[in-house]
Amino acid sequence: MSEFKYISLLQKVLATGTVRNNARNMKTKSVFGEKLVSNAEKESFPLLTTKKMYWNGIVSELNWFMKGGVDSRILQKQNVHIWDGNTSREYLDSRGLKKYEVGECGPIYGFQWRRSGARYIGMYHNYENEGVDQLQTCVDLIKKEPESRRIIVSAWNPIQLPEMCLPPCHILYQWYVNTQKGTLDCQMYQRSADLFLGLPFNIASTALLNCIIAEITGLKSNTISIVIGDAHIYENQFKAVEEQIGRPPMKYPRLKFKNKITGIDTWSKDDIEILEYLSHPAIKVPMVS
């Protein structure tokens, strides 16, 4: 995915998007049914350059997801505050989650990835051997049944949606192994994409997830595809988006593993680094929560 494709999507939504009201009491412009594709054989790591990206937050959040995290205070200790707004006392109460402690997310992404089907008892409960470890199952299938069409992780659990501080946006991942080339592709479906704040994060996170799974399974990360349902821009982002559109993209950086990653639980952000990342300055707009 060249950055120009992302910029073109921003332009399309601003120019032709349908004006809609949403549950967060802020109008959006949106389109439906978009797809972005990134080919690792032709491009480097897709970390956007038209604004400075929050790399520490991207890596830390993915590590937290992959380890089944449900306590946002773990991220806070790493100076990552992207979940603070959705786990504040006021916000949790507005979701009817008055019994949750501040920082408690409920059975969100990480829980579904690693403990799917388990009953959510709280963030202090030991969920070992409870539920289905979807992520590890995918790693095992890639190694043992690489041509399986069931290499899938889903975060969409209708029964537990009311227990989540935020229903999942990126809800499904599917992997495809090309056994002849030794490559790994990933397609992600995202029901809702905040194109300015959320999607750049999701693009990098999906690419990083595929790189890590490829590293664990001895494959080469290849194509990532992101299919988007509701692709929207909030009205408080319009000026910022116009500023970003006016910036020329730079060359993507490179991703390097400093240490060999052998399992989904055994890596840390210190094992990964981004090289040669040049970007325009950050553009800050408050997150709508």
Where is each model-derived feature located?
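Terminal, non-catalytic protein-protein interaction segments that mediate quaternary/complex assembly
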Residues: M1-S289
